[in-house]
Design a protein with these regions (language model features):
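PLD/PLD-like phosphodiesterase catalytic module centered on the HKD motif
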Residues: 1-159
Length: 159
């Protein structure tokens, strides 16, 4: 899906929305990083996948991601642990918590971008809803909420 046909540049629109099929979080993250440049990335999801992690690793190897944190759900822990080695290559920190939220936060000196989505970091052909905002208040409100989740989580280390 051509993201430029769905969304305007981040600098032109502080709030953007999409409801439909064909939009995947990984592609959206790549589109955002093309505009922001190298940034810290926070991902919160119920579940993740090999495909998402492999794509995330490609973004990291292209030096688009500085620091990265993943917060996943405890109930999806079996799948998460099976993907842990790949996660180690992608993320500086991986946390398991009571989490069903699906957000991506992208931050550097010039941008604070928040993505709120109904989509897990998996692939499917179902309709999903996504909102992108560059509103600073929204970004930091979500970051504070994510920190609260992390404060009540378990960090995966060296499995």
């Amino acid at each position: 899906m051509k993201l430029d046909s769905l969304f305007r540049p981040l600098s032109d629109a502080p709030y953007q929305y999409h409801l439909g099929t064909g939009l995947h979080t990984l592609g959206l993250l790549g589109w955002i990083l093309q505009q922001t440049g190298r940034a810290d990335v926070y991902v919160s999801t119920f579940s993740t996948s090999d495909a998402f992690l492999s794509g995330f690793l490609r973004l990291r190897r292209r030096n688009l991601i500085a620091n990265a944190t993943l917060v996943a759900d405890l109930k999806a822990a079996r799948k998460t642990v099976q993907l842990y080695r790949l996660m180690q290559s992608c993320f500086d920190h991986v946390y398991l918590a009571q989490n069903h939220s699906k957000i991506v936060l992208v931050k550097n000196d010039n941008y604070q971008v928040a993505v709120i989505s109904s989509q897990n970091q998996t692939y499917g052909d179902r309709a999903e809803c996504t909102m992108i905002t560059t509103d600073t208040f929204a970004f930091y409100s979500l970051l504070d909420g994510l920190r609260s989740i992390v404060d009540n989580s378990h960090e995966l280390n060296g499995l």
